[in-house]
Swiss-Prot record:
Protein name from the UniProt record: Phosphoribosylaminoimidazole-succinocarboxamide synthase
Cystine pairings recorded for this chain: none
Origin: domain of life: Bacteria
Keywords: ATP-binding, Ligase, Nucleotide-binding, Purine biosynthesis
InterPro entries cross-referenced by the UniProt entry: SAICAR_synt/ADE2_N, SAICAR_synth
Catalytic activity: 5-amino-1-(5-phospho-D-ribosyl)imidazole-4-carboxylate + L-aspartate + ATP = (2S)-2-[5-amino-1-(5-phospho-beta-D-ribosyl)imidazole-4-carboxamido]succinate + ADP + phosphate + 2 H(+)
EC code(s) of this entry: 6.3.2.6
Pfam families reported for this sequence: SAICAR_synt
Length: 296
């Protein structure tokens, strides 16, 4: 039975942030991150949720974090509710499968995007300038083409309801120093290349994705989520055909539907038909099953 959690309300716990998708509680020594079933598009949160979406995102993140531990440590302390502090246990039914107990890291002030294929805003940028985020690319590429090498295109972290802004690597160096910026870029590309190969063997193309990092006890760690359908473009390998947009296992399906409406992409969001909610949920669940071999 699909489970829908649009918002958490744990009176005994200290809520410190409610993002587009995640509710974050401060437990003193650690944070509790609960991934709800909220979904946003064009930086607007929809009124309807996608049942079990929070479960899918949490399980996919945990899967990837485990795969990358030798490249970079991550923020997870546990994803098992039984390991969480005593004050969380009464909320176990809402937490099961969709929550993480994590280390309190100091987040870096940039989102780290890596692109292996030309799509989305990257394709628009390339058509206009022949570059993506100032990185010159060969002439004659078509939409959804694979890039010869993945490119690193960081952005600022926007406040809720506003858009991220692409920045140059030089600007990132100014924000965090040359050594740290270089390490973040190298780690981002290394993670992407490994994930690309793992996903490829399971019939999924990861066209692009974004990571967030933090500093914990003086060490660089990966935080937030990791290569989920919310933070990545996942395409089915068996129908990949450069020269246009690709079908996907992510919220591109929802975005495409919204593009057909007479909506100005600002709140309030239009109502979503039950069929769009159902199909979006199926795409998320298929990504989990393909990657991990397990659904719910």
């Amino acid at each position: 039975m699909a489970n829908l959690v649009l918002k958490t309300d744990f009176p005994d716990l200290k809520l410190v942030a409610r993002g587009k998708v995640r509710d974050i509680y401060d437990l003193g020594e650690a944070l509790l991150i609960v991934t709800t079933d909220r979904i946003s598009a064009f930086d607007v949160i929809m009124n309807e949720g996608i049942p079990d979406k929070g479960y899918v995102l949490t399980q996919i993140s945990a899967f990837w974090f485990r795969q990358m531990e030798d490249i970079i440590p991550n923020h997870i302390i546990s994803t098992e509710v039984k390991d969480f502090p005593a004050e969380c246990q009464k909320y176990a039914a809402d937490l099961e499968g969709r929550s993480m107990l994590v280390k309190k890291a100091n987040p870096l002030p940039a989102e780290c995007i890596v692109r292996g294929y030309i799509s989305g805003s990257g394709w628009k940028d390339y058509k206009a300038t022949g570059s993506i985020c100032g990185i010159k690319l060969p002439a004659g590429l078509v939409e959804s083409d694979k890039l010869e090498e993945p490119i690193f295109t960081p952005s600022t972290k926007a406040e809720l309801g506003t858009h991220d802004e692409n920045i140059s690597f030089d600007r990132m160096v100014e924000m965090m120093g040359k050594e740290l910026a270089g390490k973040v870029r190298d780690v981002t590309i290394a993670i992407y290349k490994r994930a690309r190969d793992i996903a490829d063997a399971k019939g999924i193309i990861i066209a692009d994705t974004k990571f967030e990092y933090g500093i914990y006890n003086g060490e660089l760690i990966i935080i937030d989520e990791c290569m989920t359908p919310d933070s990545s473009r996942f395409w089915p390998k068996d129908s990949y055909k450069p020269g246009g947009a690709q079908p996907s296992f992510d919220k591109q399906f929802l975005r495409d539907y919204l593009e057909t409406l007479d909506w100005n992409k600002t709140a309030p969001a239009p109502p979503l038909p039950a069929e769009i909610v159902k199909k979006t949920g199926e795409k998320y669940m298929e990504a989990l099953v393909r990657l991990t071999g397990k659904g719910k």
